[in-house]
């Protein structure tokens, strides 16, 4: 239709488009009657959109019907050549598309690139699939190609994994199975093989698709199937006379690609079906070298086994027991099993077998891979006695005329037969230890139905970033008026221990002020103080101690914060906890003390500090190991010498006394005992209770009467309370200084992704040293 090119025409068409958006039918009707003739079919000058385009895009079926009744043409095109039907199909608006189809919209129109309406239906939704069905029912060309030479069926096969139903529908409607992209040489079969959709590959081959076509790079469909490791597609291609040994321009065979991906079954299959095992690509690498380079032992093993078989057959006078025609016949018969069983059923003698002549006749009529003499030889191998006939089930197994390792039944996981083979030795019984977590139902929920209390709201300053930031904060609360024109972001809740590890003191402070206990445990029994000690954040530790955190709280393994601090090797945090009342000989679930954790981290300063303040190094854990035994196990001679010195300086005990420390009793860090009848789930799992104060209803009569009697109504309150107050943030200079202190504390390695805390670093170094020693 005509583009509006005059000022009055422009104004009128824009007015019509605006009325379509506003659904103003009266004004549209008035403009079409009194405006330019055929105004309803005019398009605006920029994008070429008409009124029907807008209605179709918005899926306003009422407006689409109204415009069609006013005389709107369903085939008007925009500047891209797209009709309203194409725009509706692109967005999956099936209702609008159905109305346009009933209005006899032309489904064969193409846009400026040669794309028909079906190109706009290639998206992985049910609505787009229904749009494609509508287009096909009303005459869309299923063999439409773009001006660059890409057919619609090939375009659908490029996304076959997502639009499988669309591809199968195109095939049923008569799409060319040999659709080819003239610019690249790719066929629909190659694209379907690359996507790994067996149903589409089978549909193409059954409809006469060319199986041995190759693209401009001499890539065959088998190359793409092998690259993706699609074993079932490789079977299909070979069964339909596909060549799995074709060499591409870069010198790679399908076996090279299967070896690159480490697909052992694919490597075995391709090697058995005639691919050259010794062929080298342009990098001068054989398939086995490629598999070995990638570290795929199973694939390399299969190729090596095939090479040994090939070397035996290369000897003079050797006969191949698995000829290529027999392999192809076997794969084809398995693929067409249902079809062949129907043909055999007519000639069945009643015992599941047919005569030799009938067997040869049925197969000779339906395949070209084996001659009548070869089929007769196969039938003879199946006859147990003269005239005994061919057992149909035995034929489909293929083991009568092929080796067991070459039939399709040898692939895939092997089933173990009951009662066969020797019984292996019973391994050491290992008690399965699940991850111990507090169940969600044990946590009390918020009154408003929000998440559990260990999930706290993250705090952040919401302000106009063009006016204020961390380096230029507002001077006073009234100056920051951005709350009046910036919307509040939605509440975001995070695990209290994740926030603790990140050092977000503002969020923690807000949570504690709202009634969240400072010793709140998450679903892994950890309190914020434990997490802060484990991550080595001394600022958060100080903050939590100021808030009254329990320094002797325990998790499910009875670790205290001091255990975590010693395990992390944080000397200053250890001193801070001890000064705050932490028990230096607190026993964990296996009777290990903080001293044992410090020894495991190989931190000499922490071990020396604990020994100096009186930590008992004679105590033994459940395995009977003392501090000296642990030090010897971790092989730090500095700590061994230190403990040995302490042992030498001990006063000698009396002869009738044994030098064996008593394990301190396990501390109860929870509240007072509760009667079993009144015991809650939260107390069973050690979850602290959260108290939410009752909010006084401002409309309550009692509350209002108390205000009146107290003279509150006579007071003039001029207090201004800002809606939001800027929370102090660290400046850029402070953040840089904080990073410098962090580097001084944890060394420069803290800035790298592979940073490890002392214990993990110690274990890793020991393991690497042991591995290096074993290699030498």
From Swiss-Prot:
Keywords: ANK repeat, Repeat
Repeat listed as a keyword: yes
Domain of life of the native organism: Eukaryota
Residue span, EF-hand domain: 335-369
Annotated ANK repeat ranges: 47-76, 184-213, 217-246, 250-279, 524-553, 557-586, 590-619, 623-652
Outcome when changing residue 694 to N: In a breast cancer sample; somatic mutation
Protein name: Ankyrin repeat and EF-hand domain-containing protein 1
Gene: ANKEF1
């Amino acid at each position: 239709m005509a583009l509006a090119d005059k000022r009055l025409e422009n104004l009128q068409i824009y007015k019509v488009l605006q009325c379509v958006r506003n659904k103003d039918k009266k004004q549209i009707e008035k403009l079409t009657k009194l405006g330019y003739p055929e105004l309803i079919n005019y398009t605006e000058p920029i994008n070429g959109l008409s009124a029907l385009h807008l209605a179709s895009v918005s899926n306003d079926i009422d407006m689409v019907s109204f415009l069609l009744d006013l005389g709107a043409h369903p085939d008007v095109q925009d500047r891209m050549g797209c009709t309203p039907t194409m725009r509706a199909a692109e967005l999956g608006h099936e209702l609008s598309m159905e109305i346009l189809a009933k209005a006899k919209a032309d489904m064969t129109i193409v846009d400026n690139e040669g794309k028909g309406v079906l190109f706009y239906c290639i998206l992985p939704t049910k609505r787009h699939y229904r749009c494609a069905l509508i287009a096909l029912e009303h005459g869309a060309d299923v063999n439409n190609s773009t001006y660059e030479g890409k057919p619609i069926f090939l375009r659908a096969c490029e996304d076959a994994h997502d639009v499988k139903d669309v591809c199968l529908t195109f095939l049923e409607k008569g799409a060319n199975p040999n659709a080819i992209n003239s610019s690249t040489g790719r066929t629909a079969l190659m694209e379907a093989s690359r996507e790994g959709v067996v149903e589409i590959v089978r549909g193409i081959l059954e409809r006469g698709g060319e199986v041995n076509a190759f693209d401009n790079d001499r890539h065959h469909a088998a190359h793409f199937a092998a690259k993706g490791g699609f074993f079932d597609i490789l079977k299909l291609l070979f069964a339909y006379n596909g060549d799995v040994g074709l060499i591409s321009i870069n010198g790679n065979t399908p076996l090279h690609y299967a070896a690159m991906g480490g697909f052992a079954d694919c490597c075995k299959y391709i090697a058995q079906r005639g691919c050259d095992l010794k062929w080298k690509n342009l990098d001068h690498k054989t398939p086995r070298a490629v598999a070995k380079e990638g570290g795929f032992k199973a694939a390399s093993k299969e190729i090596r086994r095939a090479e040994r078989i090939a070397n035996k057959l290369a000897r003079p006078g050797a006969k191949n027991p698995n000829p290529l025609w027999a392999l192809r016949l076997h794969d084809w018969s398995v693929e067409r099993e249902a079809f062949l069983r129907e043909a055999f059923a007519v000639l069945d003698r009643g015992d599941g077998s047919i005569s030799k002549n009938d067997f040869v006749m049925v197969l000779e009529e339906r395949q070209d891979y084996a001659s009548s003499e070869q089929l007769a030889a196969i039938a003879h191998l199946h006859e147990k006695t003269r005239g005994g006939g061919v057992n149909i089930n035995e034929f489909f197994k293929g083991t009568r005329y092929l080796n067991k390792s070459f039939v399709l039944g040898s692939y895939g996981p092997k089933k173990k037969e009951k009662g066969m083979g020797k019984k292996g030795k019973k391994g050491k019984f290992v008690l399965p230890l699940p991850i111990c977590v507090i169940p969600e139902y044990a946590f009390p929920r918020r009154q408003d139905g929000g998440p559990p209390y260990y999930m706290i709201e993250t705090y952040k300053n919401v302000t106009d970033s063009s006016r204020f930031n961390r380096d230029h904060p507002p001077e006073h609360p009234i100056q920051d008026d951005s709350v009046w024109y910036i919307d509040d972001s939605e509440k975001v809740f995070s695990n209290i221990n994740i926030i603790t590890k990140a050092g977000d003191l503002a969020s923690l402070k807000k949570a504690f002020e709202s009634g969240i206990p400072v010793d709140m445990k998450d679903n892994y029994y950890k309190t914020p103080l434990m997490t802060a000690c484990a991550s080595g954040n001394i600022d958060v530790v100080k903050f939590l101690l100021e808030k009254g955190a329990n320094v002797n709280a325990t998790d499910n393994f009875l670790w205290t914060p001091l255990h975590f601090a010693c395990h992390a090797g944080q000397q200053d945090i250890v001193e801070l906890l001890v000064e705050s009342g932490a028990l230096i000989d607190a026993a964990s679930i296996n009777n290990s003390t903080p001293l044992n954790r410090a020894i495991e981290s190989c931190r000499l300063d922490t071990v020396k500090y604990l020994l100096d303040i009186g930590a008992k190094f004679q105590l033994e854990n459940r395995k009977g190991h003392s501090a000296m035994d642990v030090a010897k196990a971790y092989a730090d001679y500095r700590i061994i010498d230190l403990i040995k010195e302490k042992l030498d300086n001990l006063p000698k005990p009396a002869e009738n006394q044994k030098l064996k420390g008593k394990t301190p009793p396990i501390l109860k860090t929870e509240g007072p005992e509760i009667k079993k009848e009144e015991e809650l789930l939260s107390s069973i799992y050690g979850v602290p209770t959260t108290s939410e104060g009752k909010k006084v209803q401002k409309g309550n009569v009692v509350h209002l009467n108390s205000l009146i009697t107290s003279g509150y109504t006579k007071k003039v309150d001029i207090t201004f309370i800002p809606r939001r107050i800027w929370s102090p943030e660290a400046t850029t200079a402070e953040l840089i200084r904080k990073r410098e202190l962090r580097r001084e504390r944890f060394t420069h390695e803290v800035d790298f992704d592979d940073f490890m805390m002392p214990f993990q670093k110690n274990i890793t170094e020991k393991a690497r040293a042991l591995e290096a020693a074993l290699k030498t």
